[in-house]
């Protein structure tokens, strides 16, 4: 109960404030102080607490006795301190109630008083931590003896008896160990042989592995659909290492199975890998012959020509030339003379369109000269008008003054 009273903030401050010296401020003697300086254990008013707070926490640490929370060490410092003890200590070292607060609490006397309180509080807290531990040990030992009904030496005796019992019966333990090792580790037989049970192999797989015949490829049935894609898709399930080459000859379609290392049939990349099924072979051979013939004919025809146009190569130039010549002959069949404008379709108004750069510059410069002359004439006229107007005003002023 005593320790609980010491840690209770309200109880501690109620006892401390019951003393007459703690009912006034330590620095200014104001009544009912509600603040305190923890390092010195003194009570302060709110004004003096502000001054202490300005000094810094390394000199004075201020807390409220009503609002702030206090630790047991801080409460013990207030109990060891007090206004009366601090006042006596400062007077012994030459400090009275008057004077500056900053100089008072930064002096050597204030430092010594702060260290003295800190040492006393540390010593008291250490004694409090040692005494409760000793008392708890002293009270726990008789309780254990009363509950067990034996002294502290009884556990030792019981342990010795147990060790003797273990030593006296070594044969029994050996027998038990031997019996455990003699039991064979055999799995229990179950009535059912299904499920995950193991079965005995009738034949050896290693001996018969090389004697087995390779699986025969599934015979390929030609598809009845007209397209070649369905037949290739249906026969693709035969083997993983086989591919098919579709050929079309005489309107009949068929498939031919080739080995995996078949030699190349031709230099064509697509024919080598069986991708010529999409293009008929007869048409390709005929087209190649036609191309050879055309190239030979073109080489013979244009061997001496310096340049060749597409119209000449494909034979379309004669047709277009004949149409143009017929149109021009029909147009000018009854005329006595033909001009270039009539021949190329230019009208009489189109002759003014073709203007050279020099003509354009001459026209622009002539227009600019005309504009400048008109501007100069306008400026001359305005100058004359302003002169006549100014002279008339000046003459009127002279007449009025005279």
UniProtKB/Swiss-Prot annotation:
| Species of origin | Arabidopsis thaliana
Q: Name one GO molecular function term.
A: zinc ion binding
| Residue intervals of the Arf-GAP domain | 10-128
Q: Which SUPFAM superfamilies match?
A: ArfGap/RecO-like zinc finger
SMART domains referenced in this protein's UniProt entry, alphabetically? ArfGap
- Zinc fingers typed C4-type, residue spans: 25-48
Q: Does the keyword Zinc-finger apply?
A: yes
Q: Which UniProt keywords apply?
A: Acetylation, GTPase activation, Metal-binding, Phosphoprotein, Zinc, Zinc-finger
Name the domain of life this protein comes from: Eukaryota
Q: Pfam families from the xrefs?
A: ArfGap (PF01412)
Instruction: Please describe what this protein does.
Output: GTPase-activating protein (GAP) for ADP ribosylation factor (ARF).
Which CDD domains does this UniProt record tie to the protein? Answer: ArfGap_ArfGap2_3_like
Modified positions (Phosphoserine) are 307
What the entry lists under Gene3D superfamilies is as follows: Arf GTPase activating protein
Per UniProt, the ranges with Polar residues bias are 133-153, 225-234
Q: Which residues carry this modification: N-acetylalanine?
A: 2
Q: Which GO terms describe its cellular component?
A: plastid
Q: Where is this region: Disordered?
A: 133-166, 187-234, 278-303
As recorded in Swiss-Prot or TrEMBL, the protein's gene is named AGD9
The record's annotation in InterPro entries points to: ARFGAP/RecO, ArfGAP_dom, ArfGAP_dom_sf
Record-given protein name: Probable ADP-ribosylation factor GTPase-activating protein AGD9
Which regions are flagged for Basic and acidic residues bias? 204-216
């Amino acid at each position: 109960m005593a320790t609980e009273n010491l840690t209770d903030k309200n109880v501690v401050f109620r006892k401390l404030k019951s003393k007459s010296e703690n009912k006034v401020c330590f620095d200014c003697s104001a009544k009912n102080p509600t603040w305190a300086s923890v390092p010195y254990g003194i009570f302060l008013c709110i004004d003096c607490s502000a001054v202490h707070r300005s000094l810094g926490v390394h000199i004075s640490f201020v807390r409220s006795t009503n609002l702030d929370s206090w630790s047991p060490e801080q409460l013990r410092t207030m109990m060891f301190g007090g206004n009366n003890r601090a006042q006596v200590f400062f007077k012994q070292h030459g400090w009275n109630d008057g004077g500056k607060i900053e100089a008072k609490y930064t002096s050597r006397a204030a430092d010594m008083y702060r260290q003295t309180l800190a040492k006393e509080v540390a010593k008291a807290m250490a004694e409090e931590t040692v005494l409760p531990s000793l008392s708890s040990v002293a009270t726990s030992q008789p309780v254990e003896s009363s509950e067990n009904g034996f002294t502290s030496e009884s556990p030792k005796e019981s342990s010795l008896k147990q060790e003797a019992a273990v030593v006296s019966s070594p044969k029994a333990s050996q027998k038990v160990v031997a019996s455990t090792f003699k039991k064979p580790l055999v799995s229990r037989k179950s009535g059912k042989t299904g499920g995950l049970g193991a079965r005995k192999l009738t034949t050896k797989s290693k001996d018969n592995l090389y004697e087995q015949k390779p699986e025969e490829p599934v015979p390929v049935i030609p598809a009845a659909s007209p397209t070649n894609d369905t037949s290739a898709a249906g026969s693709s399930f035969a083997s993983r290492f086989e591919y098919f080459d579709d050929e079309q000859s005489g309107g009949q379609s068929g498939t031919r199975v080739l080995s995996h290392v078949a030699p190349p049939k031709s230099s064509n990349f697509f024919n080598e890998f069986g991708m010529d099924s999409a293009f008929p072979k007869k048409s390709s051979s005929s087209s190649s012959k036609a191309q050879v013939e055309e190239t030979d004919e073109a080489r013979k025809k244009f061997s001496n020509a310096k340049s060749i146009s597409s119209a000449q190569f494909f034979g379309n130039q004669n047709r277009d030339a004949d149409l143009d010549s017929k149109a021009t002959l029909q147009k000018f069949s009854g005329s006595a003379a033909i001009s270039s404008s009539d021949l190329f379709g230019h009208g009489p108004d189109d002759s003014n369109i073709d203007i050279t750069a020099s003509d354009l510059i001459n026209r622009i410069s002539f227009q600019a000269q005309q504009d400048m002359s008109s501007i100069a004439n306008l400026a001359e006229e305005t100058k004359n008008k302003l002169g006549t107007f100014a002279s008339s005003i000046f003459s009127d002023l002279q007449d009025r003054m005279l």
